[in-house]
Structure formats: structure tokens, C-alpha cells
Amino acid sequence: MSYADEVFKQNCRDILQNGVWDTDQKVRPHWADGTPAHTVKKFGIINRYDLQKEFPILTLRRTYFKTCIDELLWIWQQKSNNIHDLRGNIWDSWADETGSIGKAYGYQLAVKHQYPEGEMDQVDRVLYDLKHNPASRRILTNIYNFQDLHEMALYPCAYSMTFNVSGDTLNAILNQRSQDMLAANNWNVVQYSVLVHMMAQVSGLKAGELVHVIADAHIYDRHVPIIEKMLEQEPQPAPTFVMDKTVTDFYQFTRDSFSLEGYHPQPFSDEIPVAI
């Protein structure tokens, strides 16, 4: 059994059995037909993934690995906020007529800040510290910029990464304010696991743990039947993560720098509606 499947099943069972519904509340998200999109949720879920032991991708259904990589590079490498720079259409619902999602995600990572060593954006500061100040307890990014929230098409869900070096190993904490368990949970886990591998490799470190802290872990009402079917699926073995070991510059990684060997997820034909 894939460990990611085990964690996902445990989280979803806990939410369905012990979670709290918001059907008595007025909610912002809605379905395409205008119906309010209500959820059942659990507060404060924390999951740990040892990236040395296994790559945490679901086998209960396919997580589209290359599309995950595309979005990761769009945000962290290109530092873009325009969907025309991104393969696929996952952000189309939040983009304006020019393709912009406002001052969100990649935009925030591209903003330069003044440091004693000079001007750097958040990504470059992380890369600098991992190489020059690995013992620092100040290596982090945060894209939840209150000053710019009013100009964001969507407030950041996964908003902060804290990196910590222990010996020759890079660990990280991903903080997430909100998590759609069906549509996005494993998507985010896969992306930020790859990010830890990338940061570790270019810094001469080993990838260690990814700790995922979720404030509001929820299942939408129209997702419940799909989740229940997935809980009955038989998990498959986790695949092997492969990364181009010759890349030493963070900005030289491409979608082709990564692959999975032995990834055989269960068939999945359900269409997943997305609340917006």
C-alpha cells in the first residue's frame, strides 16, 4: 500500500465520521449551477511524509504528475501570475480577460526585498540561505500578503513553506489554510514533495520530511460519494520518483527533469466538480 493512500484514507474517514458540516452557514464557494458548495471539515490536520522512504502520490486514483510539475514551476520558477504561461486550464476560472490571477502566488514570490546581502525575491533568498546559512531557522516563504489580498483572484491556500536543515537533510513544513481533500490534497503533497527534492539537490542536501499542516481540511458535499468509492479501492504500491541528478541550478529544472517509475493507479472515471 502506498503511504499516501493510507494517509488520505485515514484523513477522509476522520472527516466523514467526525467532521463538522457548514450547512447552517452562508458560504462563499458555489457550484457551476449557482448552488452553495457546503463542506464537512476537520480542523488542524497534520501529515508527515518521509521523502527518503517513499514518494507520496495517490494510487487510489491518478494524480496527474506532469501537470502538478507544470503548476509548481509556474509558481516557483517562472514566478508568474498569468495563465498564458501555464500548460493546462486549472486556473481558468480565476483568471481575468488578460489571463492574470492578480497579485497572487507567483507574483508574490517574484517581489524583491532588501537584505544585508542585497535585493532578492523569496525563492532566491531560500536558495541563498540553504547554501550559505543552512543552520538558519529563518528560511521560509510566505505569499499571504495582506496588503495585496484585495488584488488577488484567489487568496493563497498553500501559503507558507518553512525549510529546515538537519545535518545533510532538508526538511520542510507546508502550511495550508484550506484544503479541498478530493480535488487538491494529493496534488499539493506531490508538488511540494518535488519542491523539497529540487531545493535539496541544488543545495547539496538530501530530501527529508515534508510536514503538511492543514487548518481546514474539508470534503465538499458533491464529493462525498466519490470519496466513499475511493475508500473502497485497493491501494497499489508507491512508484519510484526519478529526478535528473545532473541539474544543479534550480532554474534549469523542466517538466522533463522528473518522472515516476512503476506508477499504476486504480482506474477512475468520475468527473470531479470544482467549487469556485
Protein language model annotation of sequence segments:
Residues M1-I276:
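Terminal, non-catalytic protein-protein interaction segments that mediate quaternary/complex assembly
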